[in-house]
């Protein structure tokens, strides 16, 4: 029997779209208006808005809010695991993203959004690995060229 998926999560590609200033301000105004008793949904909305910002500091603040919701609201834990993983993904903290994503998939292995994020995560790690290999190869070639140049100068000065 296949388990039915019930969580409603944003597609991982939503993290690529930067939130508009107007939308962010509207959510922030709602958050500020509810002070000091902010509803869980408003807190969640602000966290998601912050994560969709192009500011690393905002993404980190959104991540912190999602972690707070995770701790304080057991009924939203699975959902928060996804958004925490997505936040770490956006920050290029791939190991942390994988850790939270695996926690979610252990509880909800059929989550289509989590499975898409897992694929994106794999692609990002693979791409980063290739870039790392190119950088290392470039450094090796540079060092070899420098050693060759230094050796040539050293040996050409010794000849009578």
UniProtKB/Swiss-Prot annotation:
SUPFAM superfamilies: TPR-like. It comes from the Eukaryota. The chain crosses the membrane at residues 130-150. Pfam families: Fis1_TPR_C, Fis1_TPR_N. TPR repeats lie at residues 78-111. Gene3D superfamilies: Tetratricopeptide repeat domain (1.25.40.10). Residues 1-129 are cytoplasmic. Residues 151-160 are mitochondrial intermembrane. The C-terminus is required for mitochondrial localization, while the N-terminus is necessary for mitochondrial fission. This is Mitochondrial fission 1 protein. It comes from Schizosaccharomyces pombe (strain 972 / ATCC 24843) (Fission yeast). The lineage of its organism: Eukaryota, Fungi, Dikarya, Ascomycota, Taphrinomycotina. The gene is fis1.
């Amino acid at each position: 029997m296949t388990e039915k998926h019930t969580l409603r999560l944003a597609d991982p590609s939503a993290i690529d779209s930067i939130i508009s200033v107007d939308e962010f301000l509207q959510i922030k105004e709602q958050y500020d208006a509810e002070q000091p008793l902010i509803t869980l949904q408003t807190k969640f909305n602000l966290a998601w808005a912050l994560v969709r910002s192009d500011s690393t500091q905002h993404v980190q603040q959104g991540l912190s809010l999602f972690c707070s919701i995770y701790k304080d609201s057991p009924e939203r834990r699975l959902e928060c695991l996804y958004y925490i993983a997505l936040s770490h993904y956006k920050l290029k903290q791939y190991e942390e993203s994988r850790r939270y994503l695996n926690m979610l998939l252990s509880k909800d292995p059929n989550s289509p959004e989590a499975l898409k994020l897992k694929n994106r995560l794999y692609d990002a790690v693979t791409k980063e690995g290739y870039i790392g290999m190119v950088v290392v190869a470039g450094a090796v070639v540079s060092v070899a060229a420098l050693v060759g140049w230094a050796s040539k100068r050293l040996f050409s000065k010794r000849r009578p």
